């Protein structure tokens, strides 16, 4: 499964913003694009769609802050 | 040995300064001496808990042994099995000492539990955090020496900031690059100076000089609607300023001392009164507490509710999460009506803020948003925060019921 496309799709869905792929290095937390609720949804979608198990304590905002970082993390954990 | 409370008087700082000099020299030469660091910690723990505080010292020892045994046991168990009921039990046991300490004065007004000690509220966060990380598989081994260093880290023992085991361990086990350490020393110096101004000048002015006058004025002006008076309004703002400068000052000392010791303890305050809304506020006020509740309570609860599809409504899930988080935070402060009211106040406020943010998002094109609306938002948030602090202060209890 194409990790990059899946992640972008999930993010676009969660944020209601299709332009998310235009700025893959945007800090999603600083800009308020993602909050804790969206984070949990993201983790659940990653689990459901990419079979990646991320326990809540493993989630460090610094490592998951931008779409590119999320893709990197997802690939690492696959 | 005299008794010295953390960062409370010049002697503490003098002894601290002298004790840290060898450490600083070591770090500047690329060396880290855990044995010496431990001796310094022991010295300070003795200074904080000796004399008339010896019972607290004994309670602390008992507490650390209890939590250590609990976490050790759970860690060993968890490597083989992962029963949820047992995890729940481990968490309940971990918070038991704190619950007892909070309940005793509630059931027996005026009395304090003998197992209580300065910092028990904060150490409990560290212990529970470790259990949750063990449950998640992030911590796989119990390391007694590191556990003790983490729990008994003296710069933050009395009131935080609340650190996390793996982050602490990483800092503790490495020797910072010389340039990086010099940078840390610079930050530490800045923290000590700013902390001094915050705690001993501003906090003192607001808390010791102004606050009693406001209290007196407010008490003398009772009789109006809800006993509201200008004195009460004055009390609200003075108390809020005292709370910030005193606690932020303490946090700066704690973080500064940590930095000198090579541990980058996370900060607690980041211009909180510049927040345009309450959600942003909790990213800037008592940050380590806020993030602890967010990560270990809110996100876990939401994860659970969403995974088990308890309800389809994301809004309901978020709201349940907020209520749980803030009510727990209220209870954590103490079993008084005003701490619980404080929790409820923030829960309701953040729920309503989400309503507003959703509305704003939907009608983005029809709502004015510029520099002035931002100032208005900051102003409104600041004042509402001060109102919540008035509740938190417990002064209304004095005003209305005594």
From Swiss-Prot, chain A:
<dbReference type="GO" id="GO:0070395">
    <property type="term" value="P:lipoteichoic acid biosynthetic process"/>
</dbReference>
<dbReference type="GO" id="GO:0005737">
    <property type="term" value="C:cytoplasm"/>
</dbReference>
<dbReference type="GO" id="GO:0071555">
    <property type="term" value="P:cell wall organization"/>
</dbReference>
<keyword id="KW-0596">Phosphopantetheine</keyword>
<feature type="domain" description="Carrier">
    <location>
        <begin position="1"/>
        <end position="78"/>
    </location>
</feature>
<dbReference type="GO" id="GO:0036370">
    <property type="term" value="F:D-alanyl carrier activity"/>
</dbReference>
<dbReference type="InterPro" id="IPR009081">
    <property type="entry name" value="PP-bd_ACP"/>
</dbReference>
<dbReference type="InterPro" id="IPR036736">
    <property type="entry name" value="ACP-like_sf"/>
</dbReference>
<protein>
    <recommendedName>
        <fullName>D-alanyl carrier protein</fullName>
    </recommendedName>
</protein>
<comment type="similarity">
    <text>Belongs to the DltC family.</text>
</comment>
<keyword id="KW-0961">Cell wall biogenesis/degradation</keyword>
<comment type="function">
    <text>Carrier protein involved in the D-alanylation of lipoteichoic acid (LTA). The loading of thioester-linked D-alanine onto DltC is catalyzed by D-alanine--D-alanyl carrier protein ligase DltA. The DltC-carried D-alanyl group is further transferred to cell membrane phosphatidylglycerol (PG) by forming an ester bond, probably catalyzed by DltD. D-alanylation of LTA plays an important role in modulating the properties of the cell wall in Gram-positive bacteria, influencing the net charge of the cell wall.</text>
</comment>
<dbReference type="InterPro" id="IPR003230">
    <property type="entry name" value="DltC"/>
</dbReference>
<comment type="pathway">
    <text>Cell wall biogenesis; lipoteichoic acid biosynthesis.</text>
</comment>
<feature type="modified residue" description="O-(pantetheine 4'-phosphoryl)serine">
    <location>
        <position position="36"/>
    </location>
</feature>
<keyword id="KW-0963">Cytoplasm</keyword>
<keyword id="KW-0597">Phosphoprotein</keyword>
<dbReference type="Pfam" id="PF00550">
    <property type="entry name" value="PP-binding"/>
</dbReference>
């Amino acid at each position: 499964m194409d990790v990059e496309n899946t992640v972008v799709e999930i993010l676009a869905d969660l944020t209601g913003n299709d332009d998310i792929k235009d700025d893959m290095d945007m800090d999603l937390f600083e800009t308020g694009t993602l909050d804790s609720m969206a984070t949990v949804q993201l983790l659940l979608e990653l689990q459901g769609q990419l079979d990646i198990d991320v326990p809540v304590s493993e989630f460090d905002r610094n490592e998951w802050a931008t779409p590119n970082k999320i893709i990197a993390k997802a690939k690492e954990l696959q | 040995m005299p008794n010295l409370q953390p960062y409370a008087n010049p002697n503490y700082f003098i002894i601290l300064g002298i004790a840290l000099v060898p450490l600083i020299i070591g770090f500047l030469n690329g060396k880290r001496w855990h044995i010496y660091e431990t001796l310094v910690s022991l010295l300070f723990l003795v200074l904080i808990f000796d004399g008339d505080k010896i019972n607290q010292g004994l309670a602390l020892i008992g507490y650390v042994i209890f939590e250590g045994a609990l976490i050790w046991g759970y860690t060993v168990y968890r490597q083989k099995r992962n029963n949820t009921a047992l995890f729940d039990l481990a968490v309940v046991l971990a918070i038991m000492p704190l619950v007892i300490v909070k309940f005793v004065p509630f059931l027996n007004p005026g009395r304090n539990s003998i197992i209580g000690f300065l910092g028990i509220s904060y150490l409990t966060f560290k212990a529970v955090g470790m259990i949750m990380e063990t449950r998640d598989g992030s911590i796989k081994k119990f390391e007694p020496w590191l556990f003790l260093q983490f729990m008994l880290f003296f710069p933050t023992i009395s009131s935080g900031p609340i650190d996390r085991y793996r982050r602490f361990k990483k800092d503790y086990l490495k020797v910072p690059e010389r340039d990086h350490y010099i940078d840390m020393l610079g930050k530490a110096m800045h923290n000590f100076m700013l902390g001094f101004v915050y705690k001993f000048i501003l906090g003192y002015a607001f808390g010791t000089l102004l606050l009693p006058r406001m209290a007196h004025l407010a008490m003398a002006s009772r009789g109006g609607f809800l006993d509201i008076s200008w004195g009460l309004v004055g009390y609200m703002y003075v108390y809020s300023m005292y709370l910030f400068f005193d606690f932020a000052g303490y946090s700066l000392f704690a973080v500064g001392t940590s930095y000198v010791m090579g541990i980058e303890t996370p900060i607690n305050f980041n211009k909180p009164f510049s927040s345009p809304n309450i959600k942003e506020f909790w990213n800037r006020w008592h940050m380590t507490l806020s993030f602890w509740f967010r990560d270990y309570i809110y996100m876990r609860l939401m994860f659970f509710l969403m995974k088990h599809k308890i309800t389809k409504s994301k809004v309901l899930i978020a709201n349940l999460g907020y209520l749980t988080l803030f009510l727990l935070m209220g209870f954590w402060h103490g079993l008084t009506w005003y701490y619980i009211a404080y929790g409820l106040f923030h829960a309701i406020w953040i729920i309503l803020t989400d309503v507003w943010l959703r509305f704003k998002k939907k009608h983005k094109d029809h709502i004015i948003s510029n520099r002035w609306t931002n100032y208005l938002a900051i102003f409104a948030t600041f004042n509402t925060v001060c109102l919540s602090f008035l509740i938190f202060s417990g002064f209304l209890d004095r005003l209305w019921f005594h």
